[in-house]
Curated annotation (Swiss-Prot):
GO CC, alphabetical: ribonucleoprotein complex; ribosome
The UniProt record lists the keyword Nucleotide-binding: no
Underlying gene: rpsH
Protein name: Small ribosomal subunit protein uS8
Organism: Desulfitobacterium hafniense (strain Y51)
InterPro entries per record: Ribosomal_uS8, Ribosomal_uS8_CS, Ribosomal_uS8_sf
Subunit field text: Part of the 30S ribosomal subunit. Contacts proteins S5 and S12.
Length: 132
């Protein structure tokens, strides 16, 4: 069966792998998933990201990050805008996650970016997900 929401699948795979303390998770590649994985790496939620080409779609391998006593760095992921109900935010309505402790990922006219960067650049867009 065809996947109706690949971004939700990506977030769910990361959430499930984190719950059972896996070191890495592999997901089918797409440009949006690559951009989300890079943002997660820049924000310090995951250790590293690898792109593996298999002459088809390719695979993204994300290495998960844990604290000193194996506590999870990613405590929560939530898909906001979904295929059945799109959620958009104007430039002055960009949401803050947990008062700035979390990250909202937005799809803007200048590509995917965090809520902080969207506020700095004065951009709004589709609110893809929250990570904290």
């Amino acid at each position: 069966m065809a996947m109706s929401d690949p971004i939700a699948d990506f977030l769910t795979r990361i959430r499930n792998a984190g719950m059972v303390y896996h070191d890495k998770v592999e997901v089918p590649a797409s440009n949006v998933k690559k951009a989300i994985a890079e943002i997660l790496k820049e924000e310090g939620f995951i250790k590293d990201v690898e792109y593996i080409s298999d002459n088809k779609q390719g695979v993204i391998r994300c290495y998960l990050k844990y604290g000193q006593n194996r506590e999870r760095v990613i405590t929560g992921l939530k898909r906001i805008s979904r295929p059945g109900l799109r959620v958009y935010a104007k430039k002055d309505e960009v949401p803050k996650v947990l008062g700035g402790l979390g990250v909202a990922i937005l799809s803007t006219s200048k590509g995917l970016m965090t809520d902080k960067r969207a506020r700095q650049e004065g951009l709004g867009g589709e609110v893809l997900c929250y990570i904290w």
